[in-house]
Regions:
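Outer membrane beta-barrel
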Residues: 1-78, 147-175
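Outer-membrane beta-barrel pore domains
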Residues: 31, 65-67, 85-232
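Active-site-proximal acidic segments at structured loop/helix or strand boundaries
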Residues: 81
Length: 232
């Protein structure tokens, strides 16, 4: 199914954009208030399926004629990750930046608290989106925080430009699920990301993405990616 949770400007801080979870989800709305409840699964490896219990509460509010804001708080609780090794959980046996203990198992579990904010308005008559996404893993003793913030500008009817800065510490979120291209994928990276998007047709679009990152917080990582997207 499509990811049911609100992610500001399609943030990939916790979930990669290509992740389509399996499981159950319930969406509830009452006036400006919305909520998303989910029981989803991460099952890349046949040896072990990780269950994720989740709850998101939020507010979607029109500030004035041209500005609206959306804010939410979410909890994502991963079931007993630290009892297992990446070989039992991820598709290729890699830990994707998360800390490992002396036995080769995950050092921490993942109980994530997530604060998200998106403001849509106009800046110099251009449709503009400001966004902020913050995550904290309460089960980790250190390197437990991550965030990304930035803006998106619709330059004209076709072109859209997006800039963001991200700092995602090694145990702030589950590395196998976060953005698979930023810093080479996984956690423990920080830096800049620039996107230029062009819709060729209503269903087909092309994105050019430049990553200017610090891989593992110290090593330069620069990559240009051309992403072709087609909506079914």
């Amino acid at each position: 199914m499509k990811n049911p949770f609100f992610k500001p400007n399609k943030s990939e801080l916790i979930f990669d954009g290509d992740y389509n979870p399996k499981g159950l989800a319930l969406n509830l709305n009452y006036g400006d208030i919305f909520s998303n409840i989910g029981y989803i699964k991460f099952d890349e490896n046949p040896f072990k399926t990780i269950d994720i219990s989740s709850l998101q509460l939020g507010l979607n509010k029109n500030i004035n004629e041209q500005t609206k804001a959306k804010i939410s708080f979410a909890i994502y609780d991963f079931e007993k990750v630290k009892e297992f090794s990446p070989n039992q959980i991820t598709w290729n046996g890699k830990n994707f930046g998360n800390s490992i203990d002396d036995n080769g198992n995950y050092l921490y579990d993942f109980s994530l608290m997530n604060l998200s904010l998106e403001i849509k308005t106009k800046m110099m008559s251009l449709p503009t989106t400001f966004f902020l996404d913050i995550v904290n893993n309460s089960d980790a003793d250190e390197n437990d925080r991550g965030f990304q913030s930035g803006l998106s500008l619709k330059i004209n009817e076709k072109w859209k430009f997006t800039y963001l800065f991200k700092d995602i510490e090694s145990d702030s979120t589950f590395g196998a699920l976060t953005h698979s291209d930023f810093g080479g994928g996984g956690t423990g990276h920080k830096g800049h990301q620039f996107n230029l998007s062009y819709p060729v047709t209503e269903r087909f679009s092309v994105d050019v993405v430049w990553f200017d990152n610090k891989k593992k917080m110290i090593t330069d990582y620069n990559k240009i990616l051309v992403d072709f997207k087609y909506k079914l």
